[in-house]
């Protein structure tokens, strides 16, 4: 499986990032999770449902510093409206079959323990996604959903454009 990578410094060549197999990517993700105050509370067994599917399906992107050290990663899924409703209203985790089940883009995990958030958000907004709007869930420590965040594609969208696009969406919470 290929590895999706990004380098904050565009002058660095992506070919310098070593190709990693599934276990190498799992190790990088685990290292970053352990550095994140929010994510390090996860029990290790959550990795089976939260990390293994996106790593196998190549629905993740790693970010590296100039020395090729991993500094962040993002996972996403394409889910159904029913899966979204279940996640928002009941909490819990997706099952394997949920990860590629529909056309709603969910950024499942955004792990950036060393900063780099503005660069990553800019990269995600300028990436080629199959839809204009994605969402992510802000969770409380107990796993319940505190907020549904909506993301719009490309930096030229304005906040009122997003509000107009939302009117046609079913929004829970």
Give names to the regions the model predicted.
Residues 46-48, 120:
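Short alpha-helical segments and helix-capping/turn motifs at coil-helix boundaries
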């Amino acid at each position: 499986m290929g590895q999706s990578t990004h380098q904050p410094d565009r002058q660095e060549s992506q070919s310098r990032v070593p190709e990693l197999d599934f276990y190498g990517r799992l190790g990088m993700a685990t290292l970053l999770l352990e550095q994140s105050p929010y994510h390090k509370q996860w029990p290790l067994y959550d990795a089976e449902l939260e990390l293994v599917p996106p790593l196998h399906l190549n629905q993740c992107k790693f970010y590296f510093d100039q020395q090729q050290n991993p500094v962040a990663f993002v996972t996403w899924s394409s889910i159904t409206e029913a899966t979204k409703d279940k996640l928002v209203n009941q909490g819990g985790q997706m099952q394997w079959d949920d990860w590629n089940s529909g056309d709603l883009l969910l950024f499942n995990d955004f792990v950036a323990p060393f900063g780099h958030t503005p660069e990553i958000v800019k990269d995600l907004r300028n990436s080629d996604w199959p839809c204009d709007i994605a969402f992510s869930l802000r969770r409380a420590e107990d796993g319940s959903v505190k907020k549904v965040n909506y993301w719009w594609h490309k930096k030229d969208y304005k906040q009122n454009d997003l509000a107009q696009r939302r009117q046609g969406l079913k929004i829970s919470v």
